[in-house]
Curated annotation (Swiss-Prot):
The keyword tRNA-binding does not apply. It comes from Streptococcus pyogenes serotype M28 (strain MGAS6180). The UvrABC repair system catalyzes the recognition and processing of DNA lesions. UvrC both incises the 5' and 3' sides of the lesion. The N-terminal half is responsible for the 3' incision and the C-terminal half is responsible for the 5' incision. NCBIfam families: uvrC. The lineage of its organism: Bacteria, Bacillati, Bacillota, Bacilli, Lactobacillales. This is UvrABC system protein C. CDD domains: GIY-YIG_UvrC_Cho. The gene is uvrC.
Length: 598
């Protein structure tokens, strides 16, 4: 804890409000709310915490707070601050969690369409459906039963669907409002589960068609009846009152929370939403934050009722969700919340079981790798790869795997400083010497195994640096790729030999992941350097364009091509004078002409 934080902790009020934790860059990394700011914020810097909270606290170098009049106001502010700043340690709802709806449009000749976007007063919406496949299946069934407008043909023209009896042409179908009202009511009844009358009508038509020997038409009616029956069986009835409601349950364990939401429409369970995330606040408060974010997403349909668990404050939920909030006390409704909670517990336990299985699998891979190489268990592995194009912008990268998992905070990038031209051996020598001379000098944690991307030559260079130049005793291995650029051989020993490694073993998959990761990291860094060098060389020697303005252009436009496509006004909007903008554009044009000339 630094002096700034110590001082600020003394000034915290005993009031409700929001607090914003910041990292060394001044970026907001966590937003929370509290009934008592003094107690809550101080709790982060006192006593012991679980690992994930310790990680959060280790990044905090400053914080701000905003005092509010009430806990409700603090909750609303917290939700807005999270939406605005998207802090990395706050709850993040899954992307694209909008569900499909069926919509009857408000047009003169209404159409039945599928949409994921709800607009107020823009038509009638039915759903949501669990996925686009289900929504399409229901729509196909409705299209065959109800002749909505399907085409955009002009008056006096009919379309293909009209001949199938699935579309009404402008001048042929009824134009009076009463007809459309009846059709829409029929659809509403059908989607609300009141489809007995429709089935009776279809059955009558099927029998009539059979009597007329129109067996194909009778078969169509039979298939429609079968389709309705299938749709019924896919929906589990959860309540007899046919009400639309969302049912929330949650469970917490080991610093993680799982929230389950049952979407019940017309008494039927049509879908559930599952979200698992680490929480850093009180469980009840983080659950409220989740609910606020959930319904702030405009694509989430707000039902007539929302059921919540007993521990949650009804008034706070009512402040963020504009519908009837119910905390069931007994009977069927309480059982529904209990069922959602039970499912949350099961989902969380499944996560822990899978995690434990993955840990055992990875731990076994590391152990087996150590036995194969006859070294201590390689808990920490550091892997290296070079990247350049014909010697230009040469770079190298190091990735670190701890207990078989990437430790991205330990990754390092290297610009090659002493090598001229494409010399992978010399580049590897420079990078390894820079890395491990520092490890030796500063007493940094050394790896249990070093892996270099390459064959015998690269491994021998690495061993020469580690053993002879630096006098270290760290095992060095090499990973060779085949002609398809895939992990193929593990080289190790003295003399170097190919280690027999079963292709389907966990240790092979681990090495494959390491090699892919270091290659990805090196290539990505090389692209960044190459782009920056290209960017800088093009913009060098322009009067009035110093390092800060070049950096500004690079951050905003990313590439020279993007600058060339931008207007003068767009570049000037960054605060760059018009005369400098004109010089930039002229320089880019001149460079282009130079390249195109013979």
């Amino acid at each position: 804890m630094n002096e700034l934080i110590k001082h600020k902790l003394e000034l915290l009020p005993d009031s409700p409000g929001c607090y914003l934790h910041k990292d060394k860059e001044g970026t907001i990394i966590y937003v929370g709310k509290a009934k008592n700011l003094k107690k809550r914020v101080r709790s982060y810097f006192r006593g012991s915490h679980d690992t994930k909270t310790e990680l959060l606290v280790s990044e905090i170098v400053d914080f701000e707070y905003i005092v509010t009049e009430s806990d409700t106001e603090a909750l609303l502010l917290e939700i807005n601050l999270i939406q605005k700043n998207m802090p990395k340690y706050n709850i993040k709802l899954k992307d694209d969690k909008s569900y499909p709806f069926l919509k009857i449009t408000n047009e003169s000749f209404p159409r039945l369409v599928i949409t994921r976007y709800i607009k107020k007063n823009d038509g009638l919406y039915f759903g949501p459906y669990p996925d686009s496949y289900t929504a399409n299946e229901v729509k196909k069934l409705l299209d065959r039963i109800f002749p909505f407008k399907k085409c955009k043909n002009p008056i006096n023209k009919v379309c293909f669907y009209y001949h199938l009896g699935q579309c009404c042409a402008h001048t042929i179908c009824h134009t009076d409002k009463a007809y459309w009202d009846r059709l829409i009511d029929d659809v509403k009844h059908f989607l609300n589960g009141k489809d007995d009358k429709i089935i009776e009508d279809l059955r009558s038509k099927m029998l009539a068609a059979s009597e007329e020997m129109a067996f194909e038409r009778a078969a169509e009616y039979r298939d429609l009846i079968s389709g309705i029956a299938t749709m019924r069986t896919k929906q589990r009835v959860m309540s007899k009152d046919l009400q639309d409601r969302d049912i929330f349950g949650y469970y917490v364990d080991k610093g993680w929370m799982c929230v389950q939401v049952f979407f019940v429409r017309q008494g039927k369970l049509i879908q559930r939403d599952v979200n698992l995330f680490p929480y850093y606040n009180d469980a009840e408060e983080d659950f409220l934050t989740y609910m606020g974010q959930f319904y702030q997403d405009k694509q989430h349909f707000i039902p007539k009722e929302v059921f919540i668990p007993e521990a949650i404050d009804e008034e706070l939920v009512a402040a963020i969700v504009p519908t009837k909030i119910i905390k069931p006390k007994r009977g069927e409704k309480k059982q529904l919340v209990a069922l959602a909670t039970k499912n949350a517990r099961v989902s969380l336990q499944q996560k822990f079981d899978l995690l434990e299985k993955d840990i055992k699998k990875t731990s076994g891979a590391i152990e087996n790798l150590g036995q194969l190489l006859k070294i201590d268990k390689p808990v920490r592995i550091e892997a290296f790869d070079n990247s350049n194009i014909q010697g230009t912008s040469p770079v190298a990268a190091m990735v670190v795997f701890v207990d078989g998992k990437p430790s991205k905070k330990d990754y390092r990038k290297f610009k090659i400083k002493t090598v001229v031209g494409p010399d992978d051996y010399a580049s590897m020598r420079e990078v390894l010497f820079r890395r491990y001379s520092r490890v030796k000098k500063e007493g940094l944690q050394a790896p249990n195994l070093i892996i270099v991307d390459g064959g015998v030559g690269q491994v021998n260079v690495a061993k020469d640096v580690i053993e002879k130049q630096l006098g270290l005793t760290i095992p060095v291995a090499g990973l060779q790729k085949n002609d398809k650029h895939q992990t193929h051989d593990l080289l190790f020993g003295n003399p170097l030999e190919v280690v027999p490694l079963p292709r389907r073993s966990e240790e092979f998959f681990l090495l494959h992941r390491i090699q892919d990761e270091v290659h990805r990291f090196a290539v990505t860094f090389h692209r960044q350097v190459r782009r920056k060098n290209s960017f800088s060389s093009t913009l060098d020697h322009i009067s009035g364009l110093g390092p800060k303005r070049k950096q500004l252009l690079l951050r905003h436009f990313k590439t020279i091509t993007a600058i060339a496509s931008a207007t003068s006004e767009e570049i000037q909007a960054l605060g760059i004078p018009k005369t400098v903008v004109e010089a930039i554009q002229q320089q880019i044009t001149d460079n282009k002409n130079d390249r195109s000339s013979p």
